Design a protein with these regions (language model features):
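Conserved nucleotide-binding and Mg2+-coordinating catalytic segments in signaling enzymes
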Residues: 1-18, 36-50, 58
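Short regulatory alpha-helical coupling segments
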Residues: 11-30, 61-69
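Cytosolic nucleotide-binding catalytic cores of signal-transduction proteins
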Residues: 28, 55, 63, 77, ...
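PAS-family sensory domain
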Residues: 29-31, 73, 148
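Active-site-flanking beta-strand signature of metal-NTP-handling nucleotidyl enzymes
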Residues: 32-37, 75
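Short, conserved catalytic or interaction motifs in soluble domains
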Residues: 46, 88, 144
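Catalytic-core segments of nucleotide cyclases and related cyclic-nucleotide turnover enzymes
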Residues: 50, 93-100, 104, 120-149
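GGDEF/GGEEF active-site signature
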Residues: 59-124
């Protein structure tokens, strides 16, 4: 089965689900799940074209691969304009700040940024999708804050 997203060259959703299943089975308490979503991505595609949207996704993927995570971490394109990171460090807030800083440095004819939701793994998580739901709820809260500004 193909496990690489053809646009970003990141792990794809199928590989992500398999990896999250393995993470939950390992019960390693030193992990965080981050869900990232590109802010105003529909507007980027509508106003600048899908080719620019694709370039933005590739640039974000490269930023995450090369600058923001350690080799022991896992990154995937969940789908559309969403990315997932399994982070095995202990400074998740610092990681989020680094991600925002690196993305801000990218040069595009439009504002490019992401919202990030994250959740630590804990002993009450028994299924990978429960962990994902926790991080996704935090992402939703971040997106709501952005809209309220």
């Amino acid at each position: 089965m193909i496990s690489i997203d053809p646009l970003t060259q990141l792990n794809n959703r199928n590989r992500m689900e398999q990896h999250l299943f393995e993470c939950v089975r390992s019960q390693d308490l030193n992990m965080y799940l981050l869900v990232l979503d590109v802010n105003r991505f529909k507007k980027i595609n509508d106003e600048h074209g899908h080719a620019q949207g694709d370039l933005a996704l590739k640039a974000i993927a490269n930023c995450l691969k090369e600058s923001c995570i350690e080799k022991s971490d896992f990154i995937a394109r969940y789908g559309g304009d969403e990315f997932v990171i399994v982070y095995k460090g202990n400074d998740v807030k610092g990681l989020c700040q680094r991600i925002h800083a690196y993305i801000k440095k990218l040069s595009f004819p439009f504002d490019l940024d992401v919202s990030i939701g994250w959740a630590p793994y804990h002993k009450d998580i028994h299924k990978w999708n429960d962990w994902f739901i926790e991080a996704d709820k935090q992402l939703y809260n971040e997106k709501k804050k952005l809209k309220d500004r």
